Amino acid sequence: MPLARLPGWLYVVACGLLLLLQHVHGQDSASPIRNTHTGQVRGSFVHVKDTKSGIHTFLGIPFAKPPVGPLRFAPPEDPEPWSGVRDATSQPAMCLQTDIMNLDGIKEMKLTVHPTPMSEDCLYLNIYTPAHAREGSNLPVMVWIHGGGLVLGSASMNDASTLAATEEIVIVSIQYRLGVLGFFSTGDQNARGNWGYLDQVAALRWVQQNIAYFGGNHGKVTIFGGSAGGTSVSSHVVSPMSKGLFHGAIMQSGVALLPDLISDKSEVVYKTVANLSGCEAPDSEALIRCLRAKSKQEILAINQVFKMIPGVVDGKFLPKHPQELLASGDFHPVPSIIGINTDECGWGIPVFLGLDHIIKKITRETLPTVLKSTAAQMMLPPECIDLIMEEYMGDTENPETLQEQFRHMLGDFMFVIPALQVAHFQRSQAPVYFYEFQHLPSFIKQVRPSHVKADHGDDILFVFGSYLWGMTFDLTEEEELLKRRVMKYWANFARTGNPNGEDLPHWPVLDHDEQYLQLNTQPAVGRALKARRLQFWTKTLPQKIQELKGSQSKHAEL
C-alpha cells in the first residue's frame, strides 16, 4: 500500500519512523556528508576504544587557497568553492619542512614515524566530532595548533579521536605554513612575515563560518596548543586580528614570550635567507621575486638551517612585541590554562637543538666556556655568566649536578619563566589556571636517560590519549586515571571556562596566593612555583646587568 493511502494516524507514525531511521543512519553512517560554505565534504566513521559511541572524522578540508606562486609570502586567501562532494577521508599533506625521519632526536628517541607526503599546498584542517553531533548540537569546540618550533609538524601528528569521543566535544586540528615559507619577513611592505600566523587566523575564521555544520558552537571556541603551538595560542591572545575568533586559550609549554620564537627585528633571518638563496637581489622586492621562483627543493635546503624560526613584530598580526602588549593590558581577556612540564629541557629539546653532547661533557672547568657560548645564543650579555653560575650551580664540583642544573637553567629560561610572566600579566583581566605536569610516562622510561622526569611534550599524551602520530602504549591504572582527569579538566574548561568539575581534585585559580595544580598521578595544589627563579630572571639579573654596564661605561670614561 502506498504511504499516502495509509490511515492518517498510521501515516504520521510511518513518517516518524522514516525520519528516525534517517537520523540514525546520519549518526552512524560510514560516510557522513556535511556542508561547508564552499561545498560538501564526505568523512568517515571511526570507532573509538572504550567509548560508547564513535566519531566522524573529516580530514583535509581546505580553509584557504593553496599558498603557491604569487601567494607564496602573501596572506592566505579564501578557498575556491567546489561542486559535488569532496573526499575528506585521508590526511592532508604536511607543509614543507625538514624531513623529520632524518632528525637525530627522532632516531635517538627510537620513535617510529610513518612517512607523510609534503606539499606547499597544505592549508587544510581536520575535524573530529561525535557521531551523534548534527547542526544545532552546539557542542563546545577546541582548535588544536601543533608545535614544532614553527618549522616542523602537521595536523596528523595528534589524533583527537579519543578526546572528541570521550568528552563529546568537536575538535579541529589545523595546519599552517612553516619555516621560511611561514615566517620569512623582509621587515617592510614587500613581505611583512608571520604568514603561518595569518594562516591560523584564516583557519579560525573558517571555524566561525562552518563549525555549526559539524555540531559545534562557534560562540564557544577554545584554542589550545603545545610548544610552538602554545606560543601560537598566546600570540592570538595579544593579536588584534584574532579578536572574537575564540573564547578560551590553553598554552602547554609555550607562550608568546618564548625567546627563540619571537623577534623585534627580521635582519638575522633576512640575511641568512638572502645568503643561502643565491639570489643576489639588490633590495627586498627583488629578493621576494627571486624566492617565489625557487623550487621546493631549494626552499627545503634553506629551511634546514633553522632549528626554529621566530615570528616577528609585523605591525599587523603583532602591532608591538607581545611583552609590551601584555604589560599594557592590550590583549583579549579570555580565561586561560597555562602550564609547563617539570623537566622541559630534560632530554628532547637539548637533543633536538644539538646541545645534548655538549651538556654531557660539562665539568666545573668547562662550564664557563659552555655558558659563554650558550649566553650568546640566548642573546644574553656576557656579564650575566657569573650571575647564572652563582644562581644555578653554586660551589658544586659534581659534573652530574652541574649538568642537571644547566638543564634546569635552560628550561627556566626557555619555558618556565616566560609562562609564569604571561600568566601574571593575563590574570589581571581574566581567570588563569596554572599547572606543572610532573608525571614521567612509564612506557618511555627505558628509552630516556634516568635523570629525566616529565620532559617537554609528555603532557600531550594525556590530553589526547595517544602519543605522536596515533601511537598507543599500555598505560598503568594510575596513568589511565591521570589521562581521564586531564581530558576532563581540558574539556570542562572548553565547556565553561573553568577546568573544575565533579570527581576532580580542585584546581585553584592563579591569584595572589600563587596557587597552581601539580598534575601527577596524585594531583596536589602547589604554591609560588619557582618564585625565586622568577625573581632572578625578571628582577635580579636585569638589574645587575644594568649596574655592571653602568660601572663599565664609567670606567671607560676614566
From Swiss-Prot:
Major localisation: other
GO CC terms, sorted: endoplasmic reticulum; intracellular membrane-bounded organelle
Enzyme Commission number(s): 3.1.1.88, 3.1.1.-
UniProt KW Signal keyword: yes
Keywords recorded for this protein, A-Z: Disulfide bond, Endoplasmic reticulum, Hydrolase, Microsome, Signal
Annotated S-S bridges: C95-C122, C279-C290
One Pfam family here: COesterase
Annotated signal peptide: 1-26
Coiled-coil residue spans: none
Residues with PTM N6-succinyllysine: K296
Gene3D superfamilies on file: alpha/beta hydrolase (3.40.50.1820)
Catalytic activity annotation: all-trans-retinyl hexadecanoate + H2O = all-trans-retinol + hexadecanoate + H(+); (-)-trans-permethrin + H2O = (3-phenoxyphenyl)methanol + (1S,3R)-3-(2,2-dichlorovinyl)-2,2-dimethylcyclopropanecarboxylate + H(+)
InterPro entries for the chain: AB_hydrolase_fold (IPR029058), CarbesteraseB (IPR002018), Carboxylesterase_B_AS (IPR019826), Carboxylesterase_B_CS (IPR019819), Type-B_Carboxylest/Lipase (IPR050309)
Subcellular location: Microsome
Active site: S227, E344, H456
Tissue expression profile of the protein: Expressed in liver, stomach, small intestine and kidney.
Domain of life where this protein originates: Eukaryota
MF GO annotations: all-trans-retinyl-palmitate hydrolase, all-trans-retinol forming activity; carboxylesterase activity; carboxylic ester hydrolase activity; retinyl-palmitate esterase activity; trans-permethrin hydrolase activity
Protein family per UniProt: Belongs to the type-B carboxylesterase/lipase family.
Function: Carboxylesterases that catalyzes the hydrolysis of pyrethroids pesticides. Hydrolyzes permethrin faster than cypermethrin. Hydrolyzes retinyl esters.
Protein name from the UniProt record: Pyrethroid hydrolase Ces2a
Annotated gene: Ces2a
